[in-house]
């Protein structure tokens, strides 16, 4: 709950800064942070390799919220790319050594699936696309 309050407080500050209409060093820092985050994403798998599969959903959610707050549409292709590529991601191997993949963001852990569901809800709200 404290994390939720912290996020909402941060979001209010960001919205206030953006609505002031004058250049803000905070907005510049947001942009720099987003660009750095995007540079860590693996273009082959669609996920942020240093974060792993389910935490990539959290990074994607942050990316989507960044776009919603700033109006930066440059990240919209990233959302689509993650949707196409991360939906079939190797999450491990079974006891026989056979690779295990998630399919359509479903794996053996409900919480992992929940993080992806939250990301796709945010993507749908931002883009208006029902596929997410």
What are these regions (language model features)?
Residues 4-5, 111:
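Residue-level micro-sites within transmembrane alpha helices that shape
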